[in-house]
Amino acid sequence: ETTLLGCKIGAMNRLPASFFVSVAYNCWAFRRLGVILDPKTGEIKRWLYKDERPIEKEVKQIIDEAKRDGAREVVLTPPISEEQIRQLRVGDVVVINGPMYTGRDALHKYLMDHDAPVDLNGQVIYHCGPVMLKDDHGKWHVKAAGPTTSIREEPYQADIIKKFGIRAIIGKGGMGAKTLQALKEHGAVYLNAIGGAAQYYAQCVKDVTGVHFLEEFGVPEAMWELQVENFAAIVTMDAHGNSLHEDVEKSSLERLAQFKDPVFS
């Protein structure tokens, strides 16, 4: 009754010298789960961490922390106007209610040379390859919808924003200088979703209203039309040329330079 997709029995750092400077990115932050097994039967005797810190509380905590730092919470319903986007600043919490479209590598490459199957003007593109399940009545349901790494779309994103009038890109990890310039020129923002919160974001999807390129690209790469409620993400690249990712990289390099002298003689 239980499908085991991955199992970590134990772990030991293989490169001790790197242990103290390792950085664990937040992709796995909300995926901690464990079980106590019966050694004779393999039966699950007890779940670990399952109800320890519900994801809803984690997300609320992240949003509350952002607000304490002076950020605003802004609710947007696509289609979104350029005026609404220009009012946003890095650090603001954006809550999306309404339509959203998924798009990964295959779709971005396709859109460079083709028209979109829907009108994307004022809309939101979500860098996501959702886990989907079709019920007995042929209706699709989202079972997991976490963000994927956005930098893979850097070769395409600026052109697609300009071509289709997209107002918001959602993903994780940020994007590069070309995309940042396009956000500024055309009035769009990049929203960083919470890595590893696939179950939480799946709960935000209230309906699947359509799908495009399913046969051509497959489930993860298809363009899914979603209706979402209370989909929260943080502005990390705004329409004024500001990038939190760029700022963090700069400050990190400055701090790293303080330790440039050899540690071991």
Question: Where would I find each of the regions flagged by the language model?
Answer:
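Short, well-ordered loop/turn sites that connect or cap secondary structure elements
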Residues: 88-89, 94
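C-terminal extensions of enzymes
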Residues: 24, 75, 101-102
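Short, surface-exposed secondary-structure edge patches
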Residues: 82-87
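Feature captures the catalytic cores and cofactor-binding loops of soluble hydro-lyases/lyases
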Residues: 1-15, 102-231
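Intrinsic disorder at enzyme termini
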Residues: 47-70
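C-terminal binding/interaction regions
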Residues: 1-33, 39-43, 54-57, 203-265
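Generic structural signal for buried aliphatic residues
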Residues: 94-96, 100
